[in-house]
Amino acid sequence: MIEIRHQTVLGAGTVRSAYDAFYRQRKLLMRDSFYLWLLELAQPQAGELLVDVACGNGRLVELAARRGINALGFDLSFEGIQAAAAETQGASWVVGNGQTIPFPDACADIVLSIGSLEHYDQPTQGARELARILRPRGRAVILLPNAFGLLGNMRYVLRHGEVFDDDQPQQRYATRRTWEAMLRRGGLAVEGVVPFNEFNAPRTPRDTVWTVTRPQKFVKAAIGRVTPLNWANHFVFLCGRAAQPDPAHYPMLAYP
């Protein structure tokens, strides 16, 4: 596992203050088609509760609420949640720490964690909390970055001699099997893995225009289709709640 820590979390500041400062300066957003694709993977049904843990600016929650889904966004940063709530109707918002989620056990039908556990102080504890709030037959959709993504870190290292740093306070990269071991240790059962290689087929008119004006995206999409799973840029883990955590030692996983 590769770890990056910025001075904002090594000095006197906290991760929360670092993220508040981060969101005051910029937004963390992907194309809408990315979030719609994740919702397709989650398959929310009428009456179910969807919780996006570490939702950031809350765009996925906003898109879910527009489609009549009972959606709740949860994030460490007050600044991020405040911005999300100002732009969204029909959703609920809570500020808190993903390592100690203030929700009762087995309360959520769907839990999403999209590019967030790798930024936690204790990622395994974050996985435990996702498993705890998930209902016994619930579904978790968890996106995590690959240390050896062909179009991601491997390409970036070839050019720069170092892994990509997205400027968040702290970041980690790992292989598929290391992330799977962490999720199992947290009490999640990995039922499937879907690759994400920085491209989604457009699902909105705006994203269609954006895509067709960037022909290089089609090249990336073609490469992504033939890229082996273990070289994907990111992994989307489709999980259920395990009967019990798997405490087995995994030498590549340094976190308890």
Where do the model's predicted regions map?
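A short SAM/SAH-binding and catalytic strip from SAM-dependent methyltransferases
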Residues: 110-121
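A short hydrophobic/small-residue beta-strand
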Residues: 71, 140-141
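A C-terminal cap/extension of S-adenosyl-L-methionine-dependent methyltransferases
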Residues: 155-161, 181, 192-256
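Short N-terminal helix/helix-N-cap motif within the alpha/beta-hydrolase-1
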Residues: 79, 120-125, 152
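Conserved N-terminal segment of class I S-adenosyl-L-methionine
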Residues: 1-100, 112, 127, 232-235, ...
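Conserved class I S-adenosyl-L-methionine
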Residues: 141-163
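A short glycine-rich, Lys/Arg-flanked "PGG" loop and its adjoining helix->strand segment in the class I
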Residues: 124-139
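Acceptor-substrate binding/catalytic loop of class I
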Residues: 160-178
